[in-house]
UniProtKB/Swiss-Prot annotation:
The lineage of its organism: Eukaryota, Metazoa, Chordata, Craniata, Vertebrata. Residues 30-697 are extracellular. This is Protocadherin alpha-6. Gene3D superfamilies: Cadherins. The keyword rRNA processing does not apply. The gene is PCDHA6. It is a single-pass type I membrane protein. Residues 719-950 are cytoplasmic. Pfam families: Cadherin, Cadherin_2, Cadherin_tail. It comes from Pan troglodytes (Chimpanzee). CDD domains: Cadherin_repeat. Residues 799-894 are annotated as: 4 X 4 AA repeats of P-X-X-P. Potential calcium-dependent cell-adhesion protein. May be involved in the establishment and maintenance of specific neuronal connections in the brain. Keywords: Calcium, Cell adhesion, Cell membrane, Glycoprotein, Membrane, Repeat, Signal, Transmembrane, Transmembrane helix. Glycans are attached at N257, N265, N386, N548. InterPro entries: Cadherin-like_dom, Cadherin-like_sf, Cadherin_CBD, Cadherin_CS, Cadherin_N, Protocadherin/Cadherin-CA.
Length: 950
């Protein structure tokens, strides 16, 4: 055969389309795979590269890729081995619903040259859904007149699976009256009904309980059960009948309210009331059907009554009952299927899942706070959503999967600075115009116990008057914790310690919640002047944190101790002491002395003495020293004076109110010759008690000597230091009188104690005077810090300040420096810590205004017992260094102890009270001659009488 050029060209043009068609068929070949639903990640689907005829080595160079109109994340290809595998969970019911066929369509594309392959992956159904009835209990009403073989419709079960897995078989529990009627309708669904096998008798059995079981065709089989409650009614013979048993309607979701869905028509062969039909929803109808639809009872017209939403519900199954008005009424039934058509009307939806709320303030960076998922029910660009977060917050959004985000911690938190954050998540779709939605998330910062309770100051000073009532509130401590809730719940407790031999908790208690400090018992200034303790504040965190604060409680003195008499034979206020006084005693002579002590301090312990009643006549021969208690003569005694005098001495302190004690002194006037005998008898009477206290007095003497030696050494050292120190500015001048001010208050603030310099014109300034500034407060509790206050501040209370021109007498100055005074000042007020009074130093030498009296002691707080002096007609003899005084007082002892050795025949009187001068009386005795025996008997009789008066 010969081919011309024209024939060859025509044949080539015809061959080219054939080759292209063959290449397209080869390139567009289609593969089919199958995979069961719910397959695990990595499940093998098929060797797609091998099946497509592609070499493994050319997959990457040829840009092998896969696309799908469905979810692309369900399947994935391993480019290393060319295997198609399951990438994420596949739910057939979610992917295809009840469609008989379900497959995933993939497009495989490779370049160089471009080739497109179509792959269908069939998703096989597995039996993972059991049959479900719409309700757990169905009620069926059956008239007893119904004939056997009557069928009553039942609500069947539904199975979300397909194929044989969704083929249901029903089984009814055993009953002689009922059976199960199963029919297959046009869409191959089974319509079940309750078959009446035997006539019912309501009077015999008004109700029947049955169980209907649905079993699917899967392997293994799954079942569902519903309870049937059959009520037998007594009604007529014909029920209304619809034209068809099932109706189907389609309507858009944006249909207006009032739109007619369908108009039903039912007929009843009965006449009259039994043929009058009313329409209604079946009692088993879902609540959402009633919310969205309504039916006219007379016409059977169903209309829309609520907004329809395709995304919320796209299918409604409505069971309608047509009931006649017979007695009893009968009903016919039909089903209306309403399918909703979709419209694009949805905004993005945001779902927040809080995982770690609240967030601890010590959480690490990257801690996941919440999970956020977004969804848009629309499709295409309208369903693509992007999320953003409120700026300038310590959090950020991290995308994990498609439409899934994690809210994580991006920087450190501090609850004390910011306790909560209000976050706003914004989701915006890709539509035009764009629709967006926001969601708020409140992130609270959980507290961590990182702050200990703190007090406003590390130490508090509290002033409390003694004799407070038990349970008295004296102070309130308060601590602040910057944390919150339990971490800021502060409880208070007492830091236990010993106070002497007792526990601190026996004195003080602290309320655990309020921090109020209470005194559990009355405090006694004489027993405890300062109580220092700590209160602990501890929070309720884990672990708990705490801190302590120190409280210094000063117990202020009150006038709660009456003066106590120290006379040996005075048994209290009702006792009496007798004293013999010669008529020859001169004016101003001390004939007796009343001694008293007061356990209080300050003005409460400053004692004054006065006669009761006061002397009504200027010629009354006796008087008592206002502050010394010394009874002295006011004039020379004469024969006209009564031989016996009963003196009542009232001892009164300066407290408010003042407390008193009364001493009775019986003074008998005797002739000078009788005094030695009386004194001798008194000395013999006192010998017994003195002998009993010899051992005690020896130890007291040793103690007094030791204290005196220590005092002398201290004074010498102090003098040496003062002499070596340079002079300071503001030294006192010699021409200015010393002014010592005292304040008229009833109690003294010991926290305001300060040492004052007392100056005189005769020597260097004195630094041993303790002055106390008063703290005036109407309340029994005074609180505050010890701060400097002016000692010259005026006060209106009594007693008034002393006259600055007042001076001590020469005899008083001698008595102040005597050993008797030092002994009394040290012993009468000595406590566990030693003497608690400072000795006042006053340097002035002016004539005393009145013998036997002394003005108030200088410096508040000096016990009045320190102002005890011996008086005589002149200055008493001063003891030299290392010597002891003739007599000194031992508190509580029955007599004045004599230290100096006396001759055996000495007649010195050793009575309990200091009386007049004995030396003068002794001289008079030596000058007198012995009387006759009658005179001696007379004197003896007088002496006996005097002793009886005592």
């Amino acid at each position: 055969m010969v081919f011309t050029p024209e024939d060859r060209l025509g044949k080539q043009c015809l061959l080219l389309p054939l080759l292209l068609l063959a290449a397209w068929k080869v390139g567009s070949g289609q593969l089919h795979y199958s995979v069961p639903e719910e397959a695990k990640h990595g499940t093998f689907v098929g060797r797609i590269a091998q099946d497509l005829g592609l070499e493994l080595a050319e997959l990457v160079p040829r840009l092998f890729r896969m696309a799908s109109k469905d979810r692309e994340d369900l399947l994935e290809v391993n480019l290393q081995n060319g295997i198609l595998f399951v990438n994420s969970r596949i739910d057939r019911e979610e992917l295809c619903g009840r469609s008989a066929e379900c497959s995933i369509h993939l497009e495989v594309i490779v370049d160089r040259p471009l080739q497109v392959f179509h792959v269908d992956v069939e998703v096989r159904d597995i039996n993972d859904n059991p049959p479900l009835f719409p309700v757990e209990e169905q009620r069926v009403l059956i008239y007893e007149s119904r004939l056997p073989d009557s069928v009553f419709p039942l609500e069947g079960a539904s199975d979300a699976d397909v194929g044989s897995n969704s083929i249901l078989t029903y089984k009814l529990s055993s009953s002689e009256y009922f059976g199960l009627d199963v029919k297959i309708n046009s869409d191959d669904n089974k319509q079940i009904g309750l078959l009446l096998k035997k006539s019912l008798d309501r009077e015999e059995a008004p109700a029947h309980n049955l169980f209907l079981t649905a079993t699917d065709g899967g392997k293994p089989e799954l079942t569902g059960t519903v309870q049937l409650l059959v009520t037998v009614l007594d009604v007529n013979d014909n029920a209304p009948n619809f034209e068809q048993s099932e109706y189907e309607v389609r309507i858009f979701e944006n249909a207006d309210n009032g739109t007619t869905v369908i108009k039903l028509n039912a007929s009843d062969r009965d006449e009259g009331a039994n043929g009058a039909i009313s329409y209604s929803f079946n009692s088993l109808v879902a609540a959402m059907v009633i919310d969205h639809f309504s039916i006219d009872r007379n016409t059977g017209e169903i209309v829309i009554r609520g907004n329809l939403d395709f995304e919320q519900e796209n299918f409604y199954k409505i069971r309608i009952d047509a009931t006649d008005k017979g007695h009893p009424p009968m009903a016919g039934h039909c089903t209306v299927l309403v399918r909703i058509l979709d419209k694009n009307d949805n905004v993005p939806e945001i779902a927040l899942t809080s995982l770690s709320l609240p967030v601890r303030e010590d959480a690490q960076f990257g801690t996941v706070i919440a999970l956020i998922s977004v969804n848009d029910l629309d499709s295409g660009a309208n369903g693509q959503v992007n999320c953003s977060l409120t700026p300038h917050v310590p959090f950020k959004l991290v995308s994990t999967f498609k439409n899934y985000y994690s809210l994580v911690l991006d920087s450190a938190l501090d609850r004390e600075s910011v306790s909560a954050y209000e976050l706003v998540v914004t989701a915006r779709d890709g539509g035009s115009p764009s629709l967006w939605a926001t969601a708020s998330l409140s992130v609270e910062v959980a507290d961590v116990n990182d702050n200990a309770p703190a007090f406003a100051q590390p130490e508090y000073t509290v002033f409390v008057k003694e004799n407070n009532p038990p349970g008295c509130h004296i102070f309130t401590v308060s601590a602040r914790d910057a944390d919150a809730q339990e971490n800021a719940l502060v409880s208070y407790s007492l830091v236990e310690r010993r106070v002497g031999e007792r526990a601190l908790s026996s004195y003080i208690s602290v309320h655990a919640e309020s921090g109020k400090v209470y005194a559990l018992q009355p405090l006694d200034h004489e027993e405890l002047e300062l109580l220092q303790f700590q209160v602990s504040a501890r929070d309720a965190g884990v672990p708990p944190l705490g801190s302590n604060v120190t409280l210094q409680v000063f117990v202020l003195d009150e006038n709660d101790n009456a003066p106590a008499l120290l006379a040996p034979r005075v048994g209290g206020t009702g006792g009496a002491v007798s004293e013999l006084v010669p008529r020859s005693v001169g004016a101003g002579q001390v004939v007796a002395k009343v001694r008293a002590v007061d356990a209080d301090s300050g003005y409460n312990a400053w004692l004054s003495y006065e006669l009761q009643p006061p002397a009504s006549s200027a010629r009354f021969p006796f008087r008592v020293g206002l502050y010394t208690g010394e009874i002295s003569t006011t004039r020379v005694l004469d024969e006209a004076d009564s031989p016996r005098h009963r003196l009542l001495v009232l001892v009164k302190d300066h407290g408010e109110p003042a407390l008193t004690a009364t001493a009775t002194v019986l003074v008998s006037l005797v002739e000078s010759g009788q005094a030695p005998k009386a004194s001798s008898r008194a000395s013999v009477g006192a010998a017994g008690p003195e002998a009993a206290l010899v051992d005690v007095n020896v130890y007291l003497i040793i103690a007094i000597c030791a204290v005196s030696s220590l005092l002398v050494l201290t004074l010498l050292l102090y003098t040496a230091l003062r002499c070596s120190a340079p002079s300071t500015e503001g030294a006192c001048t010699a021409d200015k009188p010393t002014l010592v001010c005292s304040s008229a208050v009833g109690s003294w603030s010991y926290s305001q104690q300060r040492r004052q310099r007392v100056c005189s014109g005769e020597g260097p300034p004195k630094m041993d005077l303790m002055a106390f500034s008063p703290s005036l407060s109407p309340c029994p509790i005074m609180m505050g810090k010890a701060e400097n206050q002016d000692l010259n501040e005026d006060h209106d209370a009594k007693p008034r300040q002393p006259n600055p021109d007042w001076r001590y007498s020469a005899s008083l100055r001698a008595g102040m420096h005597s050993s008797v005074h030092l002994e009394e000042a040290g012993i009468l007020r000595a406590g566990p810590g030693g003497p608690d009074q400072q000795w006042p130093t006053v340097s002035s030498a002016t004539p005393e205004p009145e013998a036997g009296e002394v003005s108030p002691p200088v410096g508040a707080g000096v016990n009045s017992n320190s102002w005890t002096f011996k008086y005589g007609p002149g200055n008493p003899k001063q003891s030299g260094p290392g010597e002891l005084p003739d007599k000194f007082i031992i508190p509580g002892s029955p007599a004045i102890i004599s230290i100096r050795q006396e001759p055996a025949n000495s007649q010195i009187d050793k009575s309990d009270f200091i009386t007049f001068g004995k030396k003068e009386e002794t001289k008079k005795k030596k000058k007198k001659k012995k009387g006759n025996k009658t005179q001696e008997k007379k004197e003896k009789g007088n002496s006996t009488t005097d002793n009886s008066d005592q």
